[in-house]
A protein has these predicted regions:
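N-acyltransferase acceptor-side catalytic subdomain
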Residues: 1-439
Length: 439
């Protein structure tokens, strides 16, 4: 069988039925409904838009196909979410410095290809495929080769795979050694014609995640803390309850269109306070409520009675999560008014409670935020893989990444030393930060 990679500029050119047949994960961000909502909700560009959005995110899905000599029909083996990018917003693996270096040397860094889920800094699979594990390694590598050839042909600066899970990351790590390729890995080229004239490069970053150690309730979780840290969290939570706050958790069809409108108002207002605008539209959120409510969790904070106004709607803050069987993903937050510790309650403590109540093993609350450490979120190494077309820049970036990786690992170890846990709750290797690809 000869394999080839082709590209399409909309997920609708693939279709929901084909996507579902290949989907081998319950990750919410890989669902057809989520990715289609980004296009249809005008968060990213789409060929179906009457007026070009010019979002800087242009769908370029990579489709790996197998061709049998005795058949004219191609078999779709794997699909990867790939996008042309005209900037670096909404990626959360920061390469602005690389772009500036290109510009200083009179070179164009954009467009580039990003192999990722838009606006979603969350580790997950980076292909959909029904192939067995060994096949999936080859499929990742053949798609990577297709991206490399596509970048060279279209004069893109390179491609970047962001937040791959263990399977995706380990398959791409092997491309750091171009001699790894053999005839089984190649598309149409022989090994001596490989487009990987220089290697892919690994990058790491650090997030803070929560892990469920069979806790029975939130109090049981806090037993893991030192006395002082436990008192601090109890004080934060008690202060809100004593003020009269009420917190509601809604899932699936319990979430109404009115709830989403209220959430969206809070979401955009929170961005507006920083003179920014959220990447996602109301239409996007309405569509995912219609098409994938089973993977949504909405936390609402109601006004204390003493603060209620003539407005009958007493919801002051919202946090919207996604979920699957083993993971909770904290993604979007907004509030009408600022209250002390309200963000921590809606975005962290309510999420932890939900995980404990539903036996969910892992909680990814979103990128950045050292304030998560004192609340028991552990430093967690995330990964990305990069291929840069320009040989000299590729070497310079590779040198930079090797130094950066040492700094990131040292930072994660140092952050772990500030976790609020008592000695009996510490891991036998307390200085080793968790690696997200192993979760």
């Amino acid at each position: 069988m000869k394999n080839t990679v082709r590209f399409v500029n909309s997920i609708h050119h693939i279709g929901a039925e084909t996507w579902q047949q290949l989907l081998n994960s319950d990750n919410p961000f890989l669902r057809f409904e989520f990715l289609a909502a980004l296009e249809d909700g005008q968060c990213i560009d789409s060929p179906y838009q009457t007026i070009p959005l010019n979002s800087g995110w242009i769908p370029n899905y990579a489709i790996l196909e197998g061709h049998n000599a005795d058949s004219q029909d191609a078999q779709i083996l794997a699909i990867a979410p790939v996008f042309q990018k005209l900037h670096s917003y909404g990626e959360y693996v920061f390469d602005w410095g690389w772009a500036e270096a290109y510009e200083r040397h009179g070179l164009k860094y954009y467009p580039k290809l990003v192999w990722a889920i838009p606006f979603t800094p969350s580790t997950g699979p980076r292909i959909i495929s029904q192939g067995h594990s060994a096949q999936q390694v080859h499929y990742h590598q053949q798609i990577a080769q297709g991206l490399t050839e596509y970048s060279q042909h279209n004069h893109f600066s390179g491609w970047h795979c962001l937040f791959p899970d263990a399977t995706s990351n380990e398959a791409l790590v092997q491309l750091a050694n171009p001699s790894h390729f053999n005839n089984q890995n190649h598309l149409n080229n022989s090994p001596d014609q490989s487009p990987f004239s220089h290697k892919t490069m690994a990058r790491t970053s650090c997030q803070f995640h929560w892990f469920n150690n069979r806790f029975t309730d939130f109090s049981h979780y806090l037993e893991k803390f030192t006395s002082r840290k436990r008192k601090n969290i109890n004080k934060e939570r008690s202060r809100l309850l004593e003020s009269g706050f009420v917190f509601n958790k809604k899932v699936g069809n319990q979430i109404t269109p009115a709830d989403i409108e209220n959430f969206y108002h809070c979401y955009q207002l929170t961005y507006a306070k920083r003179k920014m605008r959220g990447y996602l539209t109301l239409d996007f959120f309405q569509k995912i409520l219609q098409t994938m409510p089973d993977q949504l969790l909405l936390v609402q904070a109601q006004y204390p009675a003493t603060h209620q106004t003539s407005n009958h709607n007493s919801i002051v803050a919202n946090a919207l999560y996604f979920k699957d069987a083993d993971n909770l993903y904290g993604r979007y937050w907004g509030c009408l008014e600022e209250f002390d510790s309200l963000h921590f309650e809606c975005c962290y403590y309510q999420g932890i409670e939900y995980c404990i109540e539903h036996n969910i093993s892992h909680f990814d609350p979103g990128t950045q935020g050292e304030h998560k450490i004192s609340r028991g979120f552990e430093p967690t190494i995330c990964h990305s893989q990069h291929w840069i077309a320009h040989p000299q820049f590729s070497q310079a970036i590779d040198d930079f990444l090797k130094e950066e990786q040492q700094d990131i690992q040292a930072y994660a170890i140092q952050a772990a030393e500030h976790l609020p846990f008592n000695q009996s709750a510490l891991s036998p290797q307390p200085n080793k930060a968790a690696d997200k690809t192993n979760q």
